[in-house]
Amino acid sequence: PPSLFSFVVCSIDEEKFAALSRTIATRFAGMPHEVIRIPDAASLCEGYNRGFARSRGDAVVYCHDDIDLLAPDAAPRLARHLTHPDFVGVAGATRVTGPAVFWAGHPWLHGWVTYHAPGDADYEVTAMSLDAPLVTEVAALDGVFVACRRDAAAAVPYDEATFDGFHLYDLDVSYRAHRAGFRLAVACDLGIVHESKGDFGAEWSRYAARFRTKFPELSAAQGSPHFYAARVPTAADVLATQRRLAEIAAGQGRRIPARTP
């Protein structure tokens, strides 16, 4: 397992950062870790590159500040998942055809992410597919949570010149990593919860145009990025629902083994 996990977080929100720090301290209590906060990032790319330069870990985790990890053993699970892949996210696609991680649509989308904004009565448990617990041969990762080996992160820095805002940073870096021959995977068993589903407004469109300019060959029509969801009242119900999904996936022989080097 990694000897040190370095979490790099761009956060201007004291409350969110404090909550995330508590989550990391709890889940990674048995593993050496550090949390590097960038409170004044010019962009996510700039902040992540600056945070990486300050980090010391042989495993680096880039994540948003509005997440939770419900699985009690999320840390050892993540450590196991990093045995073979170079990058491990929680949602992604095995095919890239346009300016969004999930642009290709099904059947290429994977990941189990739960959504729960402050004040929500219920948790929305979603599943992109029944491939679990680790999906390999991935070509792009959503940036909500991405863990990677240090050498891989060093080889593929974030493009802060092109993506000088808060959109497309994740698709760009993960797709370049995939094209460079690094191994990407999606972990479905960390119990991740995210407060936000993302914003695809005018700012996203501006950076989508930059992505199209950088990768003109990715010009396919958008596929269907639908997902399936169940609303449950508690965090315990989230984990119970995901355990049931895992049982169904295993029963259908849908477990995708990690690829050996």
Question: What are these model-predicted stretches?
Answer:
Residues R56-G57, D142-V156:
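Conserved nucleotide-sugar donor-binding
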